[in-house]
A protein has these predicted regions:
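Hydrophobic side chains within well-formed alpha-helices
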Residues: 10, 21-22, 72
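Sigma70-family region 2
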Residues: 15-16, 39-42, 53-69, 90-92
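Short, basic/polar amphipathic helix motif occurring as a linker/hinge flanking DNA-binding modules
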Residues: 87-98
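Structural recognition of an alpha-helix C-terminal capping motif at a helix-to-coil junction
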Residues: 35, 49-56, 70-82
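Amphipathic, non-transmembrane alpha-helical scaffold segments
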Residues: 26-30, 77
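Short, charged helix-capping/linker segments at alpha-helix termini
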Residues: 1-2, 15-24, 34-53
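Acidic, Ser/Thr- and Pro/Gly-rich low-complexity regulatory segments
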Residues: 3-9
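DNA-recognition helix of helix-turn-helix
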Residues: 11, 81, 85, 89
Length: 98
């Protein structure tokens, strides 16, 4: 795992559209974020989809990251966790409607 300072630097580079920085960020954080998502969803197939969506959001939102408000991994885990919770809510809503 990279240091928080390195993660901050990578997120700043991602905000500028640096694909190599994004690949490095992904490689360094995927296992942790996948674990967060898998604990919520308990299904590997759904977790794979959610983690992809989370990284798209991380790519699109990197410019909004503020290291004064949260650590990089906390910010990224929040994005992944919130996306997983959205999926759980959607699944429970659809099962209620059925």
């Amino acid at each position: 795992m990279l240091t928080p300072a390195e993660l901050v630097w990578l997120i700043a580079a991602v905000a500028k559209g640096d694909e190599a920085a994004f690949e490095r960020l992904y490689a360094a954080t995927r296992a942790k974020l996948f674990g967060v998502v898998l604990r919520i969803l308990r299904r590997q197939d759904l977790a794979e989809e959610v983690i992809q969506e989370a990284y798209v959001k991380i790519w699109n939102s990197a410019g909004q990251f503020n290291p004064a408000l949260a650590s990089p991994i906390t910010w990224m885990a929040s994005i992944a966790r919130n996306r997983a919770i959205d999926v759980v809510r959607k699944k429970s809503e659809s099962s209620i409607e059925e």
